[in-house]
Curated annotation (Swiss-Prot):
Function: Required for disulfide bond formation in some periplasmic proteins. Acts by oxidizing the DsbA protein.
Gene (name only): dsbB
Record family assignment: Belongs to the DsbB family.
Domain of life, source organism: Bacteria
Example of a GO biological process term: protein folding
Protein name, per record: Disulfide bond formation protein B
Key words of the record: Cell inner membrane, Cell membrane, Chaperone, Disulfide bond, Electron transport, Membrane, Oxidoreductase, Redox-active center, Transmembrane, Transmembrane helix, Transport
NCBIfam families: PRK01749.1
Its membrane topology: Multi-pass membrane protein
Side Cytoplasmic, residues: 1-16, 68-74, 167-178
Annotated localization: Cell inner membrane
Disulfide-bonded cysteines: 43-46, 107-133
Top-level taxonomy: Bacteria, Pseudomonadati, Pseudomonadota, Gammaproteobacteria, Vibrionales
Record InterPro entries: DiS_bond_form_DsbB/BdbC (IPR003752), Disulphide_bond_form_DsbB (IPR022920), DsbB (IPR050183), DsbB-like_sf (IPR023380)
GO molecular function list: electron transfer activity; protein-disulfide reductase activity
Amino acid sequence: MTIFSSLNQFSKGHVSWLLLLLFIIFFEACALYFQHVMMLAPCVMCIYERVAMMGIGGAAIIGLIAPNNALFRWLGLIGWGLSSYKGLMLAMQHVDYQFNPSPFATCDLFVTFPSWAPLNQWVPWMFEAYGDCSKIVWQFFDLSMPQWLVVIFAGNLVALALIVIAQFFPVKRKNPIR
């Protein structure tokens, strides 16, 4: 059995989608820890990156519903890809704000959500921004938080690419005679 056949089989099980969801819950819990325990004020870009991360969680839930069903699995994969890509673009823009500050390129002062989903009004403790995008308030191994998000979102895209490629490799069935 090739690695891609194994990944194909793995993507058709609940464990793979649950694992993705647990990673996202961990990252969101870290964000809330930074905000409410370490008192690091989230900026507008942080909130948008948080929403992108939750998009991956939503995609994981879709895939978790019926991973053996091609429709649910592909909807989950597409949602995972779109959210990861958007998160990567946001994180790279955030890194640019931090390391190439300019008075002409700044993030918004307030988050803007659609009128049909004002997340910052519904759940302000999670989606209200009051920090400065250009300030580096935390580092780990010399990487700022948005730089870590670039790594995380890019890692999601690499994992997704491998799993999407694996969808075109047949799952080898065990020999029933043995």
